Regions:
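Sec-dependent N-terminal signal peptides
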Residues: 4-13
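Gram-negative/organellar outer-membrane beta-barrel architecture
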Residues: 364, 369, 375, 381-561, ...
Length: 719
């Protein structure tokens, strides 16, 4: 079939070899460049040939898609797809978020990484080099362009339509005309607007957006292709005079050189579009911009046809497009070549793509391995390239890897108008060889809660990936210093809690996006409290209950939440079964005369908990979230009511409630649920309110002797 298509394609090409040639030049302009699609559609519908194409920035994207056989319908479908928004926003599809390797969330604002290059040399990396995370673009440009690069052998003259794009060499202050090599790299360089998208290296030259020096490459069209007629589409303009209070206009004038957007009448026709209200990333306005370009071209069609006498049959164009697309080599990878990693690190990286050396794997395997490697932050960036070998009909996968610096300092916390303010500090060391390892020492300081924790982690790239973690932690709660909110009878609570524990955990991936975790730990807990609200601080001392516990657990965890706190998309789910055994000791603060200490009481119990939180988009701006939580514990009562309640299960769905002691939301068995109506202004701001209901299955009543009673009326909370 391919041979037949090729025969007809060459036959058709022979008839037009000496015919009038038409070149299409597309300017840059960000999302405004979607106008170009409407122009191409109008030209094709009227049988106007497009023999050559040159473009800059967004013009390079549209031009390259057409040059490798995309029809206007194909381009529209691509730009409308959910994938496209993820590509330019840097967000990862939920099914590729490898939760097993993700670090546990921490309240850090800043994570400053550095490395001791020499004995005393520290290299901090604080500011990002681009607004858009390149994690998606590094990979998707392989998916979009590598097969076309393979089909043309790296010669852009051999694409469906011969193509050129422009990038900028800011060091030598000149434009770069890209006519060969990796098509994805060429287009990526041409669109890398400074500070928005990360630049890439081409032949050891850092290449930026081509619009800096040549945003409308008619000169390249004339010099490289010599067409008889040029049709130009201009959706940009030279920067206006900078304004004192407009930082963007100042940057544009510093970065962008003036471009000649005209075409002499003797050479062709130019269509100029002026947009004052379209921003760089307004890709959701595709239909509007497409229609503007389409209608303008139709209005000028008589002028275009008077200059372009040759016509091409639409069926012939579709046939040539089909021939070219059918000859794109399918993705099948075998060998992996890695730059920027030592031999041990290379072995670790290769295990993510295939188990055996020279084993063939697919693009889907590449995609999953790519996101898995970037999930645990051992590697800061991976730039993949697919290099085609025509003899084996396979691709070599070339990976340019940048390892994360070994040391990090973290700073963060929680800022509130209440007394629940927290400061978070942490330091960490990480290293990757045959396996990845990480050591972290961090903690929080606050009026109510204080904590210090040492964590060590080792991840093994076995056939079933396995993670080992060791945690040693010390924390204190002082509930007396809490704020008195949302309660009719909020009496002072002179309670405090100290916790110390060590824990060993083993984690395995579970299903597509979850983690199974097994743990064994030992802890010492100490609760200090007064059983009466009438206290003489000169004489009375707090009662104390101490616990020495050995515990084991198995848990299943999964999350696709889009933020660490106040999420608007995704879900969080936890199912945990725990077994504890240990001893409890009670010491009264003011023992009566003749009091003898009670012996330590042994306790053993089972505890099972489940929690799920999920968010559903109900409209462009409205999201509805919900959560459900349930707890069952077979734990017996402690020596007294207060000790029992301090060790009971706690429903604390909000940041503030986690730092409060509220007996109304404590029980050994309970169910709870909540809804969260959210109005989303943008990615940074939202209005939300949360409503919760809580029902203890067997409420604990403060009687002469502790008793479980029948279920009581529900308690409610709102925030």
């Amino acid at each position: 079939m391919k041979r037949v298509l090729l025969f007809f394609s060459f036959l058709l090409c022979g008839f037009i070899l000496q015919a009038q040639k038409v070149g299409l030049v597309l300017s840059g302009g960000g999302a405004k460049g979607m106008t170009h699609i409407g122009i191409i559609r109008a030209l094709e519908e009227n049988n106007i040939p497009i023999d050559y194409i040159t473009g800059t920035s967004m013009g390079a994207i549209i031009g390259s898609l057409y040059a490798m056989g995309y029809s206007p319908d194909d381009m529209e479908a691509l730009l409308r797809s959910p994938d496209f928004k993820r590509w330019y926003s840097g967000k990862v599809e939920p099914k590729y978020e490898y939760y097993f390797k993700k670090n546990r969330p921490s309240p850090e604002f800043f994570n400053i990484r550095f490395a001791f290059r020499d004995s005393l040399h520290i290299k901090p990396q604080i500011l990002p080099t681009s607004m858009v995370n390149p994690i998606q673009m590094n990979l998707v440009f392989v998916e979009l362009f590598a097969r076309a690069t393979a089909a043309c052998g790296g010669n852009f003259n051999k694409l469906f339509v011969p193509f050129r794009c422009i990038a900028s060499d800011v060091y030598n202050k000149k434009p770069l005309v890209l006519s060969k090599g990796d098509l994805g790299d060429a287009v990526r360089a041409s669109m890398s607007f400074p500070f928005v998208f990360k630049p890439i290296e081409i032949d050891s030259t850092l290449a930026y957006d081509g619009g800096i020096y040549n945003n409308f490459p008619t000169d390249v069209m004339r010099e490289d292709f010599h067409p008889d007629v040029i049709i130009g589409s201009v959706v940009a303009a030279n920067p206006g005079k900078p304004k004192e209070n407009d930082l963007m206009s100042q940057l544009e004038n510093m970065i962008m050189q003036k471009t000649d957007y005209s075409i002499p009448d003797s050479l062709g026709i130019v269509m100029t579009f002026k947009y004052d209200d379209v921003n760089l990333l307004d890709f959701d306005r595709l239909q509007e911009l497409h229609d503007i370009g389409y209608n303008r071209t139709l209005n000028m069609m008589d002028s275009i046809k008077s200059r372009v006498h040759r016509r091409v049959n639409a069926d012939n164009v579709r046939l040539r497009r089909l021939v070219f697309r059918s000859n794109l080599p399918q993705f099948r990878f075998r060998d992996i070549i890695i730059e920027g990693a030592n031999a041990q690190q290379q072995a670790y990286i290769k295990k993510e793509f295939h188990d055996e050396e020279h084993e063939v794997f697919t693009y889907e395997d590449l995609k999953r391995g790519y996101f898995r490697l970037l999930a645990d932050n051992m590697i800061s960036e991976i730039v993949p390239h697919a290099v085609y070998d025509s003899e084996s009909d396979l691709y070599e996968l070339h990976l340019k890897v940048k390892m994360e610096d070994n040391f990090s300092v973290r700073l963060g916390g929680s800022v509130s108008t209440t007394s629940s303010n927290q400061i978070y500090l942490g330091i960490g060391y990480q290293n990757l060889n045959y396996y990845s390892k990480e050591i972290t020492f961090d903690g929080q300081l606050g009026k109510i809660y204080n904590n210090a924790q040492l964590m060590g982690k080792i991840d093994l790239p076995t056939n079933i990936p396995t993670s080992f973690r060791f945690i040693a932690s010390i924390s204190t709660f002082d509930y007396y210093k809490k704020d008195k909110l949302f309660s009719r009878n909020d009496k002072p609570s002179f309670n405090s809690k100290d916790e110390r524990f060590v824990k060993l955990m083993v984690a395995l991936p579970f299903l597509a996006n979850k983690r199974a975790e097994f743990s064994l730990g030992y802890g010492q807990l100490e609760d200090n409290y007064f059983q009466s609200s009438v206290i003489d601080f000169d004489k009375d001392r707090s009662d104390r209950s101490t616990y020495k516990l050995l515990g084991g657990s198995i848990g299943f965890y999964g999350s696709t939440l889009n933020t660490r706190q106040y999420a608007t998309k995704g879900y969080l789910e936890k199912l945990i079964a725990q077994v504890f055994t240990g001893r409890e000791r009670f010491e009264p603060g003011n023992p009566q005369e003749g009091y003898s200490p009670s012996p330590q009481e042994r306790q053993s119990w089972l505890q099972i908990s489940y929690m799920k939180e999920a968010y559903h988009t109900m409209g462009p701006k409205f999201t509805l979230g919900w959560m459900a939580e349930a707890l069952y514990s077979s734990k017996n009562f402690s020596e007294n009511y207060t000790a029992t309640m301090m060790q009971a299960g706690e429903f604390a769905p909000t940041p503030h409630s986690k730092l409060m002691y509220n007996e109304a939301f404590r029980a050994n068995q309970y169910v709870a649920a909540g809804i969260k109506p959210i109005y989303v202004l943008n990615d940074m701001f939202q209005f939300r309110t949360e409503f919760y209901g809580f029902t203890p299955i067997f409420p604990i009543k403060k009687n002469a002797c502790l008793l479980y009673t029948s279920p009581s009326p529900r308690d409610y909370a709102a925030s």
